[in-house]
Amino acid sequence: MPHFTVVPVDGPRRGDYDNLEGLSWVDYGERAEREDSDGQGNHRENSPFLSPLDASRGNDYYDRNLALFEEELDIRPKVSSLLGKLVSYTNLTQGAKEHEEAESGEGGRRRAAKAPSMGTLMGVYLPCLQNIFGVILFLRLTWMVGTAGVLQALLIVLICCCCTLLTAISMSAIATNGVVPAGGSYFMISRSLGPEFGGAVGLCFYLGTTFAAAMYILGAIEILLTYIAPPAAIFYPSGTHDMSSATLNNMRVYGTIFLTFMTLVVFVGVKYVNKFASLFLACVIISILSIYVGGIKSAFDPPVFPVCMLGNRTLSRDQFDICAKTVVVDNETVATRLWTFFCHSPNLTADSCDPYFLLNNVTEIPGIPGAAAGVLQENLWSAYLEKGEVVEKHGLPSTDTLGLKESLSLYVVADIATSFTVLVGIFFPSVTGIMAGSNRSGDLRDAQKSIPVGTILAIVTTSLVYFSSVILFGACIEGVVLRDKYGDGVSRNLVVGTLAWPSPWVIVVGSFFSTCGAGLQSLTGAPRLLQAIAKDNIIPFLRVFGHGKANGEPTWALLLTALIAELGILIASLDMVAPILSMFFLMCYLFVNLACAVQTLLRTPNWRPRFKYYHWALSFLGMSLCLALMFVSSWYYALVAMVIAGMIYKYIEYQGAEKEWGDGIRGLSLSAARYALLRLEEGPPHTKNWRPQLLVLLKLDEDLHVKYPRLLTFASQLKAGKGLTIVGSVIQGSFLESYGEAQAAEQTIKNMMEIEKVKGFCQVVVASKVREGLAHLIQSCGLGGMRHNSVVLGWPYGWRQSEDPRAWKTFIDTVRCTTAAHLALLVPKNIAFYPSNHERYLEGHIDVWWIVHDGGMLMLLPFLLRQHKVWKKCRMRIFTVAQMDDNSIQMKKDLAIFLYHLRLEAEVEVVEMHNSDISAYTYERTLMMEQRSQMLRQMRLTKTERDREAQLVKDRHSALRLESLYSDEEDESVTGADKIQMTWTRDKYMAEPWDPSHAPDNFRELVHIKPDQSNVRRMHTAVKLNEVIVTRSHDARLVLLNMPGPPKNSEGDENYMEFLEVLTEGLERVLLVRGGGREVITIYS
């Protein structure tokens, strides 16, 4: 959280100005006791230097402390008014907000909007756990361990978990790069990669979530019909080959029934789904804990689940009870049911027995030997099977011979061909669900903190569970039981349930409810994702799915989701649906990593993630891993998924989604540049994509050398913005005569740019007047979308001493041009004191004085400077001014929130400026400014006299300011010898001999001038702000502050220059910043 303090600023010190006729000192101590105080010891607006009319204007009379900025308040508001709007910020989308307001309007009263209140645990960690743990853990992980072996199973888990962990790191960077409104992962991807990629990936994520609902429903049906209620099956096999088809048909019928019921539940109300979410999560946690307890118990008291073996083949034990060929009953050997199945007759002399049955012995082995039995070593290695192959145990004696084909149904056989790649595709859905936290971003109290911490902790937790489960299963369960997918060899028990304590039913019931809950969650989330895509209107034919019920529920999207999920139900095989699901999720994760890598490599100014533990190499590794997993698990599914995504991309591009969200080689570069420039012509960039495109206006000396090369140094230190840099200059004269001179100047500037490491372009124009040439550069530099949006302009040093008013007229006219063109303006003052690229500031501060808000340039520039090695170690401080009517405490809170969302690390200080009286010093300085202005216009001074006059004024100002700012205590008795007198006073004038050749007839009127009221107020603003700034920032490495706009009336231009001089007096390095009238920094992702 940013550090902030409140600094009260006292009024100016008392001085002795008795030589000013008609002025008297205002005693603040006495006036505070009078009726014209505000009751808190603060002086009212009354002043001997302002007319009562101005003081009585009330709200129309703007704060005297900020009078310099009063002409532009409509476009550059006070900071306090901007910060107040942050309190009403909401994460809700527009439609949801309107719906909430409509609901809260019942009875004519609006309820207060409920603020997001979820923390990391409830908002991210537990939902991620619930979405990651799913049907694969309970139904397929044991089979995967038995088939791939412990070592390869650990490798599969490691690859999949690394993929999601790397994706979570990339996602955390994107999610913390600004406020993520309700919309989650789709919002992040689409706003990072643009509408084409966003739409394609969004639809892939939607299809993945929809097929996830189908997978969870199929898992629930498998648990129901296999372990809970097998008699509930509708279809039964009529022959040996009808077993699989009967199972699939049962899955289709019951799956459709379950899907219809769940869709109705979601349609009736999501609140019911959310209410049961905690119950479903509890089922998952209890089931997992029972597995661990059972594993520990098996070490000293293994559960009894015997497995019947014929030779080394595993028998399906759901059709017989006694594991023997014959039994002795009443001293008579009788055939068992097992004999009857293999010999098709209870007669012990039957000659139609299966040869393998006759030649091999029937034995019984423990299905759960326990952790102390040493089966881990046997289960280390893989045992991949082809479809229809019998599950065998290595090490048991067996006489190999061909058995009868009819007997195959009596063994435990593989229902699908298995390999490492197949298992990767089946297991990957068990690590998906990492987006659950970001999908709830609108409900989180602090999404930028909760999403990274909660998601990564959930992935670490689930990964540890998977790793430990693989080792636990391999150490406790017999290999043939592990390879028995449906538990046929252990009397049709769920294999993982055989290990659980106290009963297999804990796992059976828990896994059933957890899969049902996960299915409901998927059916709830997928329609909302489709609705978000439809509302963005990037895919026109999906527009209808953006509408819903009156309460905003996505009815049409839910209907489409149910129809697509039905396609997954009709596939009817969990092992076939899982790879499809993997493809869509891997596609989504691939583009999340791509988005992070692209943003990191481009280093756009808006890329400021609060989560710091990311790197483009990690994102690239995650992207490569996703792509590899897609082709490893199922190359043809991967191609289909990529074709679908590509078709969606081209369709959105073809439709022209106008959304704002982001030698031979030379010929190729030219073609690419032309294509890029044409694409950039669409309009101004989105705030997130804004970066400073600089036009640096240089002044050349008589030898065509750059007069202030540090302007180029400063521009190079802003190169972290990765924007365009154009360096321009003007040669005064005729183009026909000065063309060669312009070419030479251009080459000189290019050489200097190379020395200062400025990457950009140079343009020198020839014009009859410098100000016209500068106006041409401002208007015409750049090409297409690659145009400058910011102008760097040098300060006109020595304007006071110059006998030519064009010295400062050119400067002010250029300021007006940039304002008219809606360009930002940067004016580095005292540029000679700016650091070179070889210097390093090992400590210090960059101080930002945020007086009025004009687009956020003041915030963005220090961030860009601190990316450069010169300024890297400097810390950022932001000062803002609170007036008497501002709530400074609330401003502190709002500013802290604002900076947090901007992802800027800075100390914050709120400076309280009381509306004190305008001091005699201010009045005198204004008077002298106006007198000097008139004198220089009226008197025909020689150059020597004018230089002396300007130097005297400058010396007097500097001495007076130093005395005022750095005196520790007030001096009540200032002697006459210590007084600083005006250059032109009544006494001085009367004492001098009259010479009509040196003075105008109306000079005697100058000493009777009363300064303009608005000039007094503006001078008061400059003096007060300068006192505060020098007091707080005199030791800062750089001070940035708002540059007041020039007066609308050009007659006050010279006074405007004086105001700027007073405002920046006593500061070593100042950067005056004037925004271009648009936002350049945003809190959004």
Swiss-Prot record:
Superkingdom of origin organism: Eukaryota
Keywords: ATP-binding, Cell membrane, Chloride, Disulfide bond, Glycoprotein, Ion transport, Membrane, Metal-binding, Nucleotide-binding, Phosphoprotein, Potassium, Potassium transport, Symport, Transmembrane, Transmembrane helix, Transport
Catalytic activity: K(+)(in) + chloride(in) = K(+)(out) + chloride(out)
The keyword Cell membrane belongs to this UniProt entry's keyword annotation: yes
Pfam families per record: AA_permease (PF00324), SLC12 (PF03522)
Activity regulation note: Inhibited by WNK3.
Positions of disulphide bridges: C308-C323, C343-C353
Compartment annotation: Cell membrane
Subunit structure comment from the entry: Homodimer; adopts a domain-swap conformation at the scissor helices connecting the transmembrane domain and C-terminal domain. Heterodimer with other K-Cl cotransporters.
Descriptive protein name: Solute carrier family 12 member 4
Source organism phylogeny: Eukaryota, Metazoa, Chordata, Craniata, Vertebrata
